[in-house]
């Protein structure tokens, strides 16, 4: 005999009885049996607060009463109730309605019921407490013959002394009462039933005597035989095969629902569907219903296959795993229904009797029970198909696309799944916008980070948007703000070295805890979620701009660029040119940067630039460009402004190269103005001196006319560059900077400013022809300066010699001598004649110079009139306000005339 386990419940219960009564094991046998009966029973009904099970009970009641239409209507109303979310305790209301539906006029005779129960003695040697089947997660994978198992269980009662307890769901389907007296039981099942009645006391107390139970008669057994016993084929059939029953198909379908082949219903790989075995005979109606029901198994397999494959794929990411978890959760609810259906069949199998036609599970009733699950599985299968090959935000977008449906039941299901799928995305998002941390191992978030990028390019290149991963329930503006928030936090920490906690930097100091409800991503995009994003965006951006302006003087550096690199500080630029002129006229190869730097510092100290911030002045420097053969200092000189740290994010290398190009252009234009000023000074100073040389009047008149044309041209160009280009663009930039909400707005406004002045200063690729003509004009001005300087040198030298000759002549005459000898007079006349003979050469040189200059200006005007920029076309009017060049150039007459007619028609 086996030694009993000292820790088993049976031994412990017997020891407890002995300890309480103070007697031996033999003396407490009666009390021990009573204790077993008490534990095996449940005197208080156990009501589990499960809305699903209460709903299924109500549906079963409709089916039992043959009110399938009312059952379908109840399912639809219940779905609407779930989608509205008005009631919080739906279970309580449903349970109340179920209780009220019982007929109060037919109270069960509890006394007779209890008498019938207690008339059945408990087994004498019961050594185990009853086990109640509590909603398994899935059905058994093996297919067993329930009738054989039931017979074995009944036979084991007498041999082992342990009662075989039927397996019921605590709140599962209510089986028909089998406590109708001994006359209703078949002789071969009576002993087994008597052994089981005591352990089901709790169920009987909870369920009571239903009206259907009181009316149950001995008609149950014939029904059982008719449903379970196979029927032979009709006489007209040629084969002698046996036609399978509806009950067998129901049993098979419960396994097919889980993707397991049954005895008669199996997967057909060629057609990819479940079919009834062709070797067995089934009526057409049953085969059609079986085909409809077996679709659940195919849908189940499709979903299960997807979850099994993706659950093992770690690269699928958190969003994908959440999607799989949502599918698992739906399958779990599906398995719960199968458990209820399975327990309904087990009632009949374990007891060995049928519950009657009204409570039996038929294929048609199975259709009603699986109507809602089939809709859910179809929706899930469609989601699985649509989400193939997607991950992260793209997967969330695919799920979100299915929420745009008019079916409230389907929309509620997909929204629930979307809430689970969007949960990791919301975690990523909150971690990013409140802490600046990006923990995206599997690249699921729509913000991407490049670890190779260094700190100096953090703002521009390190973080970017993965457009394919932006969820469809988020707008591009929201995504851009999310990117800017986290980028600003990282910029503050890594570039500005500002370690201010996020809670202090932002008014909304939300921690990075997991959000309670991810559904706000798609249900309240314009209110709560938008408010959070906007609050974090405005606070973070404002704090970043405050740090840049107060700690790093961003606006002052921007103004310094305008004053020095764009020649806005007029007194400084003029004085610098005066100081640099002796150095810059030399060949470029003879210049030394330290000499030019010293001159720059002198110009700063002598002008209003000395009052600027020392932080700005120390960044101002001299830069020499690459030297080409024949270059002078004017061609290679440039001012430079050193930028580093956070301000280098705004003034990037590309921006500084643009500033350098603009400075060289403005510097050359300013030099032309400087040259023409010197030419005008030469005219004013030498006009009286050369009055005594009438032969030069024609040449000087030519010089004055050409100089006036050049001065007019340069003045109009300077006006255009200074006011229409620089000042207007700068004013627009400054207004944008003051109104900027984030650093990107400042960078964008600054880039637009540079692009505008590059374009309007003719430095872009589209204006290359105009720039070449303008440089040719500048070259002609320099040539004119050289020609006039040569003319004045020759004229002044000749004037000096004439004055010296006259002075010597007067001295000799005062001494009483001849003023001049014949030889000296011949030499003087010869020299004067040679000078006079050189004047036509000078005049022709000036005429050629004038011709070239006017030709270049005319070509420049033609290009201006055909330009697409309206400001450049207006510039052509000012350059030729008196139509001087228009009279000389036919193309100008055509272009301007056409333009005039166009403006007239407009």
Swiss-Prot record:
Segments of skewed composition (Polar residues): 208-229
Assembly with partners or alone: Interacts with gamma-tubulin.
Top-level taxon of origin: Eukaryota
UniProt feature coiled coil, ranges: none
A Pfam family: GCP_N_terminal
GO molecular function: gamma-tubulin binding; microtubule minus-end binding
A single cellular component GO annotation: gamma-tubulin complex
This protein's name: Gamma-tubulin complex component 3 homolog
Family: Belongs to the TUBGCP family.
GO biological processes: cytoplasmic microtubule organization; meiotic cell cycle; microtubule nucleation; mitotic cell cycle; spindle assembly
Biological role stated in the UniProt entry: Necessary for the recruitment of gamma-tubulin to the centrosome and for the formation of a functional centrosome.
Entry keyword set: Cytoplasm, Cytoskeleton, Microtubule
Region of interest called Disordered, as start-end residue ranges on this chain: 208-242
Subcellular location: Cytoplasm, Cytoskeleton, Microtubule organizing center, Centrosome
């Amino acid at each position: 005999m086996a030694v009993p386990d000292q820790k088993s419940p049976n031994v412990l219960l017997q020891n407890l009885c002995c300890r309480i009564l103070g007697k031996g094991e033999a003396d407490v046998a009666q009390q021990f049996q009573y204790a077993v009966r008490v534990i095996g029973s449940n005197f208080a009904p156990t009501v589990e607060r499960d809305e699903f099970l209460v709903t299924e009970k109500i549906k079963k009641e409709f089916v039992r009463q043959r009110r399938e239409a009312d059952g379908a209507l109840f399912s639809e109303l219940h779905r609407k109730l779930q989608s509205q979310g008005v009631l919080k305790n739906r279970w309580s209301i449903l349970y109340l309605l179920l209780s009220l539906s019982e007929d109060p006029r037919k109270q069960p005779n509890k006394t007779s019921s209890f008498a019938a129960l207690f008339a059945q003695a408990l087994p004498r040697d019961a050594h185990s407490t009853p086990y109640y089947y509590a909603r398994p997660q899935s059905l058994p994978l093996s297919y067993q013959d329930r009738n054989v198992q039931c017979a074995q269980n009944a036979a084991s009662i007498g041999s082992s002394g342990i009662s075989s307890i039927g397996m019921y769901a605590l709140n599962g389907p209510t089986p028909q009462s089998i406590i109708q007296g001994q006359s209703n039981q078949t002789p071969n099942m009576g002993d087994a039933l008597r052994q089981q009645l005591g352990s089901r006391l709790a169920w009987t107390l909870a369920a009571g005597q239903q009206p259907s139970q009181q009316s149950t008669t001995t008609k149950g057994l014939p029904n059982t035989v008719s449903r379970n016993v196979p029927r032979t084929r009709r006489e007209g059939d040629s084969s002698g095969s046996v036609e399978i029953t509806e009950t067998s198909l129901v049993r098979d379908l419960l396994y097919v629902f889980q993707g397991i082949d049954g005895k008669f219903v199996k997967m057909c790989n060629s057609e990819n569907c479940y079919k009834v075995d062709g070797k067995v005979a089934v009526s057409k109606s049953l085969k059609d219903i079986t085909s409809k029901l077996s679709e659940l198994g195919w849908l189940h397999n499709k979903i299960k296959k997807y979850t099994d494959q993706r659950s093992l794929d770690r690269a699928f990411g958190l969003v994908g795993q959440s999607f799989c978890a949502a599918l698992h959760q739906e399958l779990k609810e599906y398995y719960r229904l199968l458990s209820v259906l399975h327990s309904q069949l087990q009632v009949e199998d374990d007891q060995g009797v049928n519950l009657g036609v009204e409570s039996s599970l038929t294929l048609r009733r199975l259709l009603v029970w699986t109507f809602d699950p089939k809709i859910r599985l179809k929706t899930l299968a469609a989601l699985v198909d649509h989400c193939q090959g997607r991950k992260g935000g793209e997967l969330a977008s695919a799920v979100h696309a299915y929420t745009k449906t008019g079916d409230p039941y389907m929309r509620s299901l997909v929204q629930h799944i979307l809430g689970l799928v969007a949960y990791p995305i919301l975690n990523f998002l909150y971690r990013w916008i409140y802490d600046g941390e990006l923990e995206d191992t599997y690249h699921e978030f729509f913000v991407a980070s490049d670890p190779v990028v260094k700190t100096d390019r953090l703002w521009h290149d390190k973080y970017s948007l993965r457009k394919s991963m932006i969820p469809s329930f988020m707008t591009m503006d929201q995504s851009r703000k999310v990117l800017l928030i986290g980028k600003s936090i990282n910029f503050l920490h890594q570039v500005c070295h500002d370690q201010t906690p996020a809670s202090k930097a932002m008014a909304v100091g939300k921690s990075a805890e997991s959000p309670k409800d991810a559904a706000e991503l798609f249900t309240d995009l314009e209110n709560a979620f938008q408010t959070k994003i906007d609050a974090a965006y405005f606070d973070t951006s404002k704090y970043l701009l405050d740090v840049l302006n107060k700690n790093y003087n961003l606006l002052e550096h921007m103004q310094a660029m305008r004053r020095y690199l764009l020649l806005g500080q007029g007194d400084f630029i003029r004085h610098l040119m005066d100081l640099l002129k002796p150095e810059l006229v030399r060949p470029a190869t003879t210049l030394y940067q330290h000499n030019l730097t010293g001159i720059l510092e002198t110009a700063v100290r002598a002008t209003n630039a000395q009052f600027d911030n020392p932080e700005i002045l120390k960044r101002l420097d001299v830069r020499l460009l690459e030297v080409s053969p024949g270059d002078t200092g004017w061609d290679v000189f440039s001012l430079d402004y050193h930028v580093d740290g956070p301000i280098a994010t705004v003034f990037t290398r590309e921006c500084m190269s643009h500033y350098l190009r603009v400075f060289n252009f403005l510097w050359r234009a300013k030099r032309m103005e400087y040259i023409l000023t010197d030419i005008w000074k030469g005219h004013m100073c030498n006009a009286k001196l050369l009055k005594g040389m009438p032969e030069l009047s024609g040449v000087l008149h030519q010089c004055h006319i050409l100089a006036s044309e050049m001065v007019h041209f340069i003045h109009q160009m300077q006006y255009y560059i200074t006011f229409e280009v620089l000042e207007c663009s700068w004013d627009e930039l400054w207004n944008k900077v003051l109104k900027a909400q984030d650093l990107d707005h400042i960078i964008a406004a600054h880039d637009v400013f540079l692009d505008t002045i590059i374009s309007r200063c003719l430095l872009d690729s589209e204006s290359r022809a105009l720039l070449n003509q303008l440089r040719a004009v500048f070259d002609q001005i320099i040539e004119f300066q050289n020609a006039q300087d040569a003319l004045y040198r020759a004229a002044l030298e000749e004037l000096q010699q004439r004055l010296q000759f006259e002075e010597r002549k007067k001295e000799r005459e005062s001494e009483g001598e001849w003023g001049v000898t014949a030889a000296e007079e011949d030499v003087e006349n010869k020299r004067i004649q040679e000078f006079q003979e050189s004047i036509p050469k000078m005049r022709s040189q000036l005429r050629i110079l004038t011709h070239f200059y006017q030709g270049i200006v005319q070509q420049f005007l033609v290009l201006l009139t055909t330009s697409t920029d309206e400001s450049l076309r207006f510039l052509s009017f000012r350059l030729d306000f008196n139509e001087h060049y228009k009279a000389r150039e036919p193309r100008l007459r055509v272009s301007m005339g056409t333009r005039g007619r166009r403006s007239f028609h407009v």
